[in-house]
């Protein structure tokens, strides 16, 4: 297998090709990509945790250093000004010398405001890509060249197609996240609180809570019915019934995003429902192939949910087709089947149909689906179906013509378990689907 350095070299070739194309299309000379800046808390001298511009880390795996700049023109070697101040108050990252630095000119930038003297004098035809427009204006970059929509759309669209380097990084992120999931599962079995389970996860992954790509969802019992629950109770409940963990990891700026659900007692209706959701998730993945719309798989899973609602007698005396048609499956799975994954957890361009930014919205019936693209090789997506017992979504169904079809006694018995989500990260290849998560033996 090629080394990471060799993969990165080819990655840069691909990014250079895309850069040439976008510069030609919009008649630009170069892109100036800013890593970003620290942002202080209001009325304070402490900064929020730094989050790098994803368009910057697409080029170089520098994720923790603000005030860095990249100049790329698609022809010459990318030029990186790496912020290297003299500072005895804060840690200063050394000038990098690693697998990727042969492909980039790395130049020390001792002062954050010193970039102006380093750039070409003529900047009227350079596009700024970054989070601080006023910094670009201060560099005499025209306002219409600051994050121009056409350029951003183009860059975002092609980020869906991962290079071999990117896929390698994402597989490494999977390994780290799987280690965390295994440690968290053991902590759950030992009766730990959500807070302590999260600590076990972070220790196993070697991440801080500011390093993970999103806030870990560590949900015991009914907390699993809150889709993005991040509270982390310090005390374990008196009775632990279930555990939903949605937590990822990052490698060289690329994310993993995994979810598993466990029952404390393996011989309960809820435990059997977990197994069935898991089986249906794997069955759905087995049907996936390039050339099919992601929307089709979302709709297909609602049909699978209807089958499970019938099997477990959660909804009765109604055909599976009628359940889907009348959206009785909707309150049980209110989110989409998944989303694109990459430099960002909810990666960009999920709705773009071409590199000019043509937008195809999610179906009105399923407004929270995050991707409407046709699957193509090199795309990476999550597949994360769920079944939840959420009062605010189910209560409106307690009245009306369909109420009699809901087994409210069964639903009320399942509510204390919260809900189920099973999430894998998959790569679309020309003739197969690679399940990066299951390849790491995460059951």
UniProtKB/Swiss-Prot annotation:
The gene coding this protein: pepQ
GO-annotated cellular components: cytosol
Family: Belongs to the peptidase M24B family. Bacterial-type prolidase subfamily.
Taxonomic superkingdom: Bacteria
CDD domains in the record: Prolidase (cd01087)
Reported function: Splits dipeptides with a prolyl residue in the C-terminal position.
Swiss-Prot/TrEMBL cofactor(s): Mn(2+)
Protein name: Xaa-Pro dipeptidase
Binding site for Mn(2+) 2: 246, 257, 423
Organism: Enterobacter sp. (strain 638)
């Amino acid at each position: 297998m090629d080394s990471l350095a060799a993969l990165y070299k080819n990655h840069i070739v691909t990014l250079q090709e895309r850069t040439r194309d976008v510069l030609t299309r919009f008649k630009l000379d170069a892109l100036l990509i800013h890593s970003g800046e620290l942002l202080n808390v209001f009325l304070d001298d402490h900064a929020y945790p730094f989050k790098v511009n994803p368009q910057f880390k697409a080029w170089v795996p520098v994720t923790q250093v603000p005030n860095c700049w990249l100049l790329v023109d698609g022809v010459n070697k990318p030029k990186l000004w790496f912020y290297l101040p003299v500072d005895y108050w804060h840690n200063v990252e050394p000038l990098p010398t690693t697998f990727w630095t042969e492909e980039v000119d790395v130049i020390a930038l001792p002062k954050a405001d010193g970039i102006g003297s380093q750039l070409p004098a003529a900047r009227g035809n350079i596009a700024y890509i970054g989070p601080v427009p006023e910094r670009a204006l201060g560099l005499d970059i025209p306002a219409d060249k600051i994050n121009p929509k056409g350029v951003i759309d183009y860059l975002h669209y092609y980020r869906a197609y991962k290079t071999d380097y990117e896929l390698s990084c994402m597989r490494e992120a999977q390994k780290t996240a799987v280690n965390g999931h295994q440690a968290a599962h053991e902590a759950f079995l030992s009766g730990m609180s959500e807070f302590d389970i999260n600590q076990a996860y972070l220790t196993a992954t070697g991440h801080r809570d500011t390093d993970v790509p999103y806030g870990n969802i560590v949900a015991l019992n009914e907390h699993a019915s809150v889709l993005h629950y991040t509270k982390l109770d310090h005390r374990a409940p008196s009775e632990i019934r279930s555990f939903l963990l949605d937590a990822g990891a990052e490698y060289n700026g690329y994310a993993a995003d995994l979810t598993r659900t466990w029952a404390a007692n393996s011989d309960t209706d809820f435990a059997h429902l977990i197994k069935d959701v898991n089986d249906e998730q794997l069955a759905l993945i087995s049907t996936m192939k390039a050339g099919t719309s992601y929307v089709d798989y979302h709709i297909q899973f609602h049909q699978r949910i209807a089958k499970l609602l019938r099997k477990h007698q959660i909804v009765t005396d109604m055909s599976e087709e009628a359940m889907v048609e009348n959206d009785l499956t909707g309150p049980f799975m209110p989110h989409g089947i998944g989303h694109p994954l990459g430099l960002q957890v909810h990666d960009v361009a999920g709705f773009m149909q071409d590199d000019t930014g043509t937008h195809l919205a999610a179906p009105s019936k399923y407004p929270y689906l995050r991707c409407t693209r046709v699957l193509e090789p090199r795309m990476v997506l999550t597949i994360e179906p769920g079944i939840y017992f959420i009062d605010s979504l189910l209560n409106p169904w307690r009245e009306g013509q369909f109420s009699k079809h809901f087994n409210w006694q069964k639903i009320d018995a399942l509510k204390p378990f919260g809900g189920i989500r099973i999430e894998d990260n998959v790569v679309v290849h020309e003739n197969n689907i690679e399940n990066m998560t299951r390849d790491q033996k995460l059951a």
